[in-house]
């Protein structure tokens, strides 16, 4: 972009505003402002420049369209159902390893570690820390139910990663990830004294925190030996790595954190710049990390200028039989006087001096047997791996340096090109059954011809032995009756990631068909004749009459040892006639076919065992599912029977209480009747008698009253009769008086 001089450059207000917006957006997001805002600022800037020619012209290049991004790389989700256990705040929690990350059972955490906190508090902290909890699959839920971790009525279960569980527990149990700073006036009084053995450390987990480590205080795994330089509080190492005061993260995806791996997270402070001081403090830190490391998870870094003994031994075993022969492109083996087979010497230009002194240790002797190019390879790999840029330092969430992977990719250029097919495998894969095939790729201009593994023991070097004490070299490959295979070696694609054992199995199966064609006498005779007529053939060695005896003397041995012994005796005796060579070739082919038959039988047995194991696994899974279903049904039936039993027991208790109450009432009534029946009857009868007496008295009184009334009426009648008689006597005569008196008397009687 072309601009005017810096002193006279004045950015346009629109451009300045865009830059400010970009600066603010880039601090809180991964992208920045949208593309149209920058394009709008550019167009407005051009328009303003066209209107005002006095301002300096700033030519902005046209914005290139964004490159087409490749499609997403789809991978099947990891639905692991292998249950394991982990320790969280002293509690054992069940978990599943999904994608390399432990996912813990959330209900188990809530009921054990966080049982003193409410769901509202936990949800608020999860929102603050941007913690997301996933749901377990049906298989995982079934396993948790079968193991008794969840009840069978649980519809689902949440899973939380080990990293988020550490953050959540630290925020709730220890006052949050970002505790407040202590007052500065008290910081000087509680600050630890800086001694020769104490030094500053830091970590970059969930933000950055610096502390002062005092190794003397690290007396047990939970001892508080690190003081935070901000709050001056003491923490044990596994709590210090989750302690922080600065929110340096913005929606960071945390993965793979485990406070038990604090030895990888705590680093030496960058304030120490002196080489000697840094080395001394680094050694103290390593010694402190090695204390109480019962699982031996922490391993001290090896110096960059040399390899550890374990790495040297592993490299020695890996390249023990793999050396490059520029003449024929195949690996060669030699038999030492002690009976051990070792690779032959490399070319003279790369040959190293070998000290055969008996005073050397076995490790040094084995190290001297390595070729010069192998040593240069190891040294170059050490340099490439050990050379790490200071800016690419290890961190809690950046434990690998980009330089390591890049140098490891360049490591293959130092090695001879290996044949990327099934003819190369580890010498440990079938060391009890077959000979190790360590064939290397020949130069590009030569035709690739694969020989049987039995022919790889023959050296193409024609150098004579230097002394009688040294093992004599094998003859040139052209002298040996090695069977050339007409089929070229099949190279496998580079993306083939199968194991070495499976690769060797495929090669053996393909090689069996070629060996069957080699077993015919016509082919062996023609091939041996071709070998006899080849140029550069040396004078044949006189045949030994003891060849047949030597060829069959080791018939009792089997496998690799018998084959190697047979070849050694045959080559030591020498072959001079065509018949002897053909006979030797027939023996080799017969032995190889027999060995292949044994290998095929072993592979078939292994395949059948694998199938049976898979069948048993499926059957076991099916039985487990059936048992789980039966257990669930049985539990449901037990729950139903328990509910019915409880209901019946409740009804029986209620009826028992009611009957008991009625019985008590009846008993009270019966007791009262027995004690009060006579008195009640007596009182009843007395009352009746009194009533009758009262009634009798009333009747007597009424009778007396009636008698008195009757007496009064009689007296009144008598008086009336007198009065009437007197009146009759006075008024009427005597006759009439008689008749009237009679009538009156009759009326009175009536």
From Swiss-Prot:
Originating organism: Gallus gallus
Gene3D superfamilies in the cross-refs? SAND domain-like, Ski
Could you give a single Gene Ontology term from the biological process aspect? negative regulation of BMP signaling pathway
For this chain, the annotated S-S bridges are none
Keywords from UniProt, A to Z, are: Coiled coil, Nucleus, Proto-oncogene, Repeat
Q: Which InterPro entries match?
A: c-SKI_SMAD4-bd_dom (IPR014890), DHD_Ski (IPR047315), DNA-bd_dom_put_sf (IPR009061), SAND-like_dom_sf (IPR010919), SKI/SNO/DAC (IPR003380), Ski_DNA-bd_sf (IPR037000), Tscrpt_reg_SKI_SnoN (IPR023216)
Q: What is the protein's known function?
A: May play a role in terminal differentiation of skeletal muscle cells but not in the determination of cells to the myogenic lineage. May function in TGF-beta signaling.
Q: Where is the composition biased (Low complexity)?
A: 371-384, 479-492, 512-528, 735-750
What start-end ranges are recorded for coiled-coil regions in this protein?
Answer: 558-732
Spell out the molecular function terms from Gene Ontology.
Answer: DNA-binding transcription factor activity, RNA polymerase II-specific; DNA-binding transcription factor binding; protein domain specific binding; protein homodimerization activity; RNA polymerase II cis-regulatory region sequence-specific DNA binding; sequence-specific DNA binding; SMAD binding
Q: What is this protein called?
A: Ski oncogene
Q: Provide the family line.
A: Belongs to the SKI family.
Q: Where is this region: Disordered?
A: 329-386, 447-542, 727-750
Q: Where in the cell is it found?
A: Nucleus
UniProt KW Ribosomal protein keyword: no
Q: What is its main location?
A: nucleus
UniProt biased composition (Polar residues): 458-469
Q: Where is the composition biased (Acidic residues)?
A: 493-504
Superkingdom of this entry's organism?
Eukaryota
Which PANTHER family does this entry report, sorted A to Z? SKI ONCOGENE, SKI ONCOGENE-RELATED
Q: What GO cellular-component annotations does this UniProt entry give?
A: cytoplasm; nucleus; transcription regulator complex
């Amino acid at each position: 972009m072309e601009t005017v001089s810096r002193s006279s450059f004045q950015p346009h207000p629109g451009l300045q505003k865009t830059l400010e917006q970009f600066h603010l957006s880039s601090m809180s997001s991964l992208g920045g402002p949208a593309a149209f805002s920058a394009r709008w600022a550019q167009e407005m800037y051009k328009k303003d420049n066209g209107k005002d020619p006095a301002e300096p012209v700033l030519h902005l290049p046209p914005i290139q369209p964004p490159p087409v991004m490749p499609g997403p790389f789809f991978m099947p989700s990891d639905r692991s159902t292998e249950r394991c256990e982990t320790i969280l705040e002293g509690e054992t929690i069940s978990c599943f390893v999904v994608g390399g990350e432990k996912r813990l059972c959330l209900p188990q955490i809530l009921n054990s570690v966080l049982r003193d906190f409410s769901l509202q508090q936990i949800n608020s902290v999860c929102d603050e820390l941007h913690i997301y909890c996933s749901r377990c699959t049906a298989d995982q839920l079934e396993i948790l139910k079968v193991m008794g971790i969840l009840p069978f009525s649980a519809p689902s279960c949440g899973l939380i990663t080990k990293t988020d569980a550490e953050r959540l527990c630290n925020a709730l149990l220890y006052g949050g990830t970002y505790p407040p700073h202590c007052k500065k006036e008290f910081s000087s009084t509680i600050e630890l004294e800086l001694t020769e053995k104490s030094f500053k450390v830091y970590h970059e987990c969930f933000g950055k925190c610096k502390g002062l480590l005092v190794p003397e205080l690290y007396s047990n795994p939970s001892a508080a030996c690190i003081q935070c330089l901000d709050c001056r509080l003491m923490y044990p190492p596994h709590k210090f790595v989750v302690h922080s005061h600065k929110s340096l993260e913005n929606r960071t995806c945390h993965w793979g954190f485990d406070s038990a791996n604090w030895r990888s997270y705590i680093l030496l402070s960058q304030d120490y710049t002196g080489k000697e001081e840094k080395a001394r403090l680094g050694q103290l830190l390593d010694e402190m990390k090695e204390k109480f490391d019962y699982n031996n998870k922490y391993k001290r870094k090896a110096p960059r200028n040399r390899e550890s003994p374990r790495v040297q031994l592993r490299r020695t075993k890996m390249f023990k039989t793999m050396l490059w022969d520029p003449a024929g492109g195949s690996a060669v083996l030699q038999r030492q006087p002690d009976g051990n087979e070792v690779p032959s010497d490399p070319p003279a230009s790369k040959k190293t001096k070998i000290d055969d002194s008996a005073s050397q240790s076995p490790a040094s002797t084995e190290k001297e047997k390595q070729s010069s190019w192998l040593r240069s390879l190891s040294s170059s790999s050490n340099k490439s791996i050990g050379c790490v840029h200071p800016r690419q330092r290890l961190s809690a969430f950046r434990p690998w340096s980009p330089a390591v992977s890049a140098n490891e990719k360049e490591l293959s250029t130092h090695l001879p090109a290996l044949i990327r097919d099934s003819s190369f495998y580890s010498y440990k894969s079938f060391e009890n059954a077959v000979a190790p095939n360590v064939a290397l790729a020949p130069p590009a201009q030569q035709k690739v011809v694969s020989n049987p593994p039995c022919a790889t023991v023959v050296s193409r070097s024609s150098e004579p032995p230097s002394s009688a004490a040294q093992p004599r070299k094998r003859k040139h490959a052209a002298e040996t009756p090695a069977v050339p295979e007409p089929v070229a070696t099949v190279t496998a694609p580079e993306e083939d990631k199968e194991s070495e054992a499976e690769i060797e199995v495929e090669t053996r199966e393909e090689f069996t068909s070629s060996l069957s064609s080699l077993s015919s006498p016509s082919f062996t005779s023609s091939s041996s004749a071709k070998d006899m007529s080849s140029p550069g053939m040396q004078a044949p060695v006189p045949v030994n009459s003891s060849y047949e005896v030597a060829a069959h003397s080791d018939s009792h041995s089997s496998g690799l040892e018998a084959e190697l012994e047979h070849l050694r005796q045959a080559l030591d005796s020498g072959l001079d006639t065509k018949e002897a060579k053909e006979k030797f070739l027939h023996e080799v082919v017969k032995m190889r076919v027999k060995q292949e038959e044994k290998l095929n039988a072993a592979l078939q047995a292994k395949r059948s065992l694998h199938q049976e194991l898979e069948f048993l696994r499926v059957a076991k899974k099916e039985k487990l599912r059936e048992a789980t279903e039966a257990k669930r049904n049985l539990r449901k039936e037990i729950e139903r029977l328990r509910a019915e039993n409880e209901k019946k027991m409740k009804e029986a208790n209620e009826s028992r209480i009611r009957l008991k109450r009625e019985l008590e009432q009846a008993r009270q009534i019966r007791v009262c009747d027995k004690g009060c029946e006579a008195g009640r009857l007596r009182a009843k009868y007395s009352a009746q008698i009194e009533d009758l007496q009262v009634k009798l008295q009333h009747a007597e009184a009424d009778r007396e009253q009636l008698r008195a009334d009757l007496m009064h009426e009689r007296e009144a009648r008598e008086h009336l009769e007198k009065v009437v008689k007197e009146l009759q006597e006075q008024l009427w005569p005597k006759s009439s008086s008689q008749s009237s008196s009679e009538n009156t008397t009759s009326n009175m009687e009536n």
